[in-house]
């Protein structure tokens, strides 16, 4: 394994003058972690480290954001991102996130953060539907079309000098023999990881319930859970806006229901038509969309990916190649972006490549342990949904909202109050004030339309403490 001080010791250019620290010392690892400080190689002043030749296999958000974060810290890095699909092609529909991720994005690269926020939809409240009954949860969040996110990050990476290559497939790691570092960002079925499977100690565990990731031309204003009874059992979806025209809609059910409805034998088009009939009320008659990336959506089972270590020699895992979390937690892309920030941080702070990879491995694996545990709990809750669905809907919605752990008694009282329209409006106004405060604190000037104004990246802003964590 190469030292950062050997071989490709390309000195950074004037354009790559070291950034000041992007955050303070690391706290106890959490899933929100992702700050950076200047690299300090032995005998060198802070911020005068060496550049490397880095290749990212896979061109998803994690790979692109790592390239951005690494280039922001050292413009001398020679970074290539290799993606097998053409530009604009992506699976799935939307990506959800919260203010905590925006804090990290603004701290690490305000330019792309502003573009992401401006292109995102805001959803206020969560709506839980069971037949014609409705209950509410007083949470808010943001979502963005995955294709739009990829476009923003690709353009920003290219601006910073990253070589983003599409329509290229890596069949043999020998093609990358001249790379100082190979970052495996090629998803849960990572071929790069499989080459060194014995070293990474990969464990795969499949969930019980089948699910299918669809779109819909109904634009939801709230994050919506819809549960519908059928002769074969309960079936449900999770939906949220992806853009001004489209929402994401993930449908799930027990395997007995899936087979009982014939969804295991119907082709995609017929299966989608059946789901449209089942969810006609919740969809207000709108269509479900079963084509993504030019391919028909298919039913699948979630697979949890865990690895005993995320690095081997000069290969390191990032995002779904390293770990997966159940979609009911909604954290996959967010966690990949935090991995990207942490890896860039470790490369920037450690003098030797082995030490950098070990630091990244230690911190992010520690941060992911509780997240994956919570995701397993969430998955199991939905796999045993029949235990809860006969409850009063308001109590069912509360049980769903606290499925990852007990809450203080007042939390239930707040939930009951949220069912009253006037009090729900008060809570929404309080959330609006919180959003504005957080936006101002991170330098984003929220306007009535939800757009943002540009803020210059100053040394003081980059050195600010870690952002709000939800």
Regions from the PLM with identified roles:
Residues 178-302:
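Conserved FAD-binding catalytic core of PHBH/FMO-like flavoproteins
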Residues 2, 6-47:
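Compositionally biased, low-complexity flexible segments
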Residues 345-470:
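C-terminal helical "tail/cap" subdomain of flavin- and related membrane-associated enzymes
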Residues 86-104:
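Conserved N-terminal glycine-rich FAD pyrophosphate-binding loop of Rossmann-like flavoproteins
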Residues 62, 87, 189:
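Conserved Rossmann-like nucleotide-cofactor binding loop
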Residues 47-50, 98-213, 420-447, 468:
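Conserved N-terminal helical subregion
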Residues 71-91:
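Glycine-rich FAD pyrophosphate-binding loop
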């Amino acid at each position: 394994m190469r030292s950062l001080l050997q071989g490709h010791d390309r000195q950074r250019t004037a354009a790559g003058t070291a950034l000041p620290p992007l955050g303070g010392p690391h706290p106890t690892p959490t899933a929100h972690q992702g700050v950076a400080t200047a690299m300090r190689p032995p005998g060198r002043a802070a911020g005068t480290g060496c550049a490397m030749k880095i290749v990212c296999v896979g061109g998803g958000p994690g790979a692109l954001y790592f390239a951005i974060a690494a280039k922001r810290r050292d413009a001398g890095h020679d970074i290539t991102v290799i993606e097998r699909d053409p530009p604009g092609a992506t699976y799935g529909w939307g990506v959800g996130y919260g203010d905590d991720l925006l804090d990290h994005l603004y701290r690490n690269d305000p330019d792309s953060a502003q573009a992401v926020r401006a292109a995102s939809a805001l959803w206020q409240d969560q709506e839980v539907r069971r037949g014609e009954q409705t209950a509410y949860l007083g949470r808010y969040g943001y979502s963005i079309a995955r294709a739009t996110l990829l476009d923003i990050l690709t353009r920003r990476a290219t601006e910073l000098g990253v070589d983003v290559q599409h329509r290229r497939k890596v069949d043999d790691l020998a093609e990358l023999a001249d790379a100082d570092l190979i970052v495996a960002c090629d998803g849960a079925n990572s071929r790069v990881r499989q080459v060194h499977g014995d070293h990474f100690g990969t464990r795969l565990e499949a969930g019980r319930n089948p699910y299918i990731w669809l779109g819909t031309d109904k634009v939801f204003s709230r994050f919506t859970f819809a549960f519908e009874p059928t002769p074969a059992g309960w079936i449900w979806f999770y939906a949220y806006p992806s853009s001004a025209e489209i929402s994401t809609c993930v449908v799930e059910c027990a395997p007995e229901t899936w087979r009982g409805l014939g969804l295991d034998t119907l082709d995609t088009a017929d299966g989608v038509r059946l789901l449209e009939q089942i969810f006609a009320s919740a969809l207000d008659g709108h269509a479900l969309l079963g084509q993504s990336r030019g391919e028909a959506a298919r039913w699948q089972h979630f697979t949890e990916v865990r690895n005993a270590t995320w690095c081997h020699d000069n290969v390191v895992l990032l995002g779904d190649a390293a770990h997966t979390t159940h979609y009911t937690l909604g954290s996959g892309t967010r966690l990949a972006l935090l991995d990207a920030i942490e890896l860039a941080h470790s490369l920037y702070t450690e003098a030797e490549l082995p030490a950098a990879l070990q630091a990244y491995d230690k911190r992010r694996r520690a941060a992911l342990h509780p997240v994956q545990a919570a995701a397993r709990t969430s998955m199991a809750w939905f796999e045993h949904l029949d235990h809860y669905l006969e409850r009063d809907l308001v109590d069912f919605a509360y049980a769903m909202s606290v499925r990852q752990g007990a809450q203080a008694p007042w939390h239930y009282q707040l939930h009951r109050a949220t069912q009253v329209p006037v009090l729900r409006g008060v809570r929404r106004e309080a959330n609006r004030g919180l959003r504005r405060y957080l936006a101002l604190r991170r330098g984003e000037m929220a306007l009535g339309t939800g757009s943002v104004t540009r803020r210059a990246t100053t040394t003081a802003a980059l050195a600010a403490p870690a952002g709000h964590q939800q």
